[in-house]
Amino acid sequence: MRVWVPVGVLTSLAYCFHQRRVALAEQRAPNGQRPVDRNLLELKMVQVVFRHGARSPLKPLPLEEQVEWNPKLLEIPPQTRFDYTVTNLAGGPKPHSHYDTEYRKTTLRGGVLAGQLTKVGMQQMFALGEKLRKNYVEDIPFLSPVYNPQEVFIRSTNMFRNLESTRCLLAGLFQHQKGSAVIHTDEASSEVLYPNYQSCWVLKEKTRGRKKAAISQPGISEDLEKVKTGVGINNGDDVDFFVLLDNVAAEQVHSLLNCPALERFAQLIEQRAVDMALYVVEQEDRESIQMAVGPFLHILEGNLLKTVDPTTAPSKTRKMYLYATHDVTLLPMLLALGIFDQKWPPFAVDLTMELYQHQESKEWFVQLFYNGKEQVPRGCPDKLCPLDKFLNTMSVYSVSPEKYRTLCSKTRIVELGE
C-alpha cells in the first residue's frame, strides 16, 4: 500500500491527493499544538453507504390523469452491465424477497411495476461507481483496478432495485471485466440495512403512533389538505406527504412531472415529508434511532475497529465496504451523526467514511463525506476527525444485536404503553 510522504518522487501523487479533497490543511491536531500534515496520512479503509438509483414510484397517486411509465424506461445501458451473484450472509442461496413479491402486485400505467430501477437510476449508479473509481483507483492507488473479493465486501438489501443499483455501481467502479462479483444480502426478518418493523415490534408501534400524530400536527395537516385539494386527491384517500414525495421525486428525475399543481407544490411536499420524518424519528429520542439504524451503525463501527486492531487477520478485513440501502436508512443515520441537511436523501446519494492513519504518530482519523461534501460529525473538532471522537459519536446510537433484541422486545410495548 502506498504511503503518502512529502518527498520529491511523490510530488505528482501528492498533487493528486490535493485534488482529491485531502490536501494539506491548516487544521489543528486534537491536542491543539500542531497542524495535521495530511501528506503523512495513509488511507486504510473506506465504507460507502448509498441509496439506490432512481426508480418508479412505490404507490401511484389516485389521480385521474396517471403518469405513463413506459417499459423503455427500464432499458439497461450497455456500460452498466456487470455479472454478479447473490448469496445470503453465510454464502448460501439468495433469500426470498418478500418486497419484490409485493411490488409485482402493482403495475403502473404504461406497464412498469412499482419500485423498479430505471435507466436513469442505472446511469446515476454508474456515475457514482465512476466517482469511486476516480477517487480510489485512479487518483490514488488504493483499490485494484479490477474487482477483488479480498479487497471489497458488498452487501445490499434484498430488493431487485438495490441489487441492480449495486451492479451499475460496480460497472462504474471496475469497468468491464470477466468474472462475477458476490453481493451479500439477508433475510427480511433480520435485515439491518433499513429500519426493520418485522423484527422490531417496538419500533413498528412507535412509528405507527408518531406517524399518525405527525399528520395531525398544526401546519402539516393544513398543508396536506391544501396539496390534496390542489392536485385533485380526495381527503379520504390514504395519501400522506411520504407518498406524495415518492411520486414527485420519481416523476421529476424522469422528466414526467406533468401535473402543474404537483410541480407547484413540489418544494412544500419535500419540506413537509422531512418535517414528518423528523417528528417520527426524533433526534432527542435516542432509542428510536437506535432501533432504526443502531445495528447497522454497529456493523460500520465494527469494521473500523477491526481495521485498527493490529491483531485482526488480513482475511477478516477489506479495503472497501459497499452497502446498498434506502432513504429511510440514510435519514436516521445522518441524524445520528449530526449532519442532516434538512433535505430528503436523493436517489444515488452516498455517505462515505474514510479511515486514515498518520504515518509518524500512528494516530487514526476519519473523514466523512455526504453527497460529495465534507462533513463535520457531531463531537468532532473539524472535518478530519480523530477516530476516538468519531467512535464516541457513533456509540451513542450504535447497538449490539443483543441490545437490539432487548430494545425491540414485545414485552417493552406493554412497558412503554404504561
Swiss-Prot record:
Gene3D superfamilies linked: Phosphoglycerate mutase-like
One GO cellular component term: cytoplasm
Top-level enzyme category: hydrolase
Enzyme Commission no: 3.1.3.2
GO biological process: hematopoietic progenitor cell differentiation; lysobisphosphatidic acid metabolic process
Region (Substrate binding): 51-161
Transit peptide: 1-25
Major place of residence: mitochondrion
Record-linked SUPFAM superfamilies: Phosphoglycerate mutase-like
Keyword terms: Hydrolase, Lipid metabolism, Mitochondrion, Phospholipid metabolism, Transit peptide
InterPro entries in alphabetical order: Acid_Pase_AS (IPR033379), His_Pase_clade-2 (IPR000560), His_PPase_superfam (IPR029033), Histidine_acid_phosphatase (IPR050645)
UniProt-annotated catalytic positions: 52 (nucleophile), 327 (proton donor)
UniProt-recorded Gene Ontology molecular function terms: acid phosphatase activity; lysophosphatidic acid phosphatase activity
Catalytic activity: a phosphate monoester + H2O = an alcohol + phosphate; 1-(9Z-octadecenoyl)-sn-glycero-3-phosphate + H2O = 1-(9Z-octadecenoyl)-sn-glycerol + phosphate
Locations listed in the record: Mitochondrion
SUBUNIT field: Monomer.
Family per similarity comment: Belongs to the histidine acid phosphatase family.
Function comment: Hydrolyzes lysophosphatidic acid (LPA) containing a medium length fatty acid chain to the corresponding monoacylglycerol. Has highest activity with lysophosphatidic acid containing myristate (C14:0), monounsaturated oleate (C18:1) or palmitate (C16:0), and lower activity with C18:0 and C6:0 lysophosphatidic acid.
This protein's name: Lysophosphatidic acid phosphatase type 6
Source species: Mus musculus (Mouse)
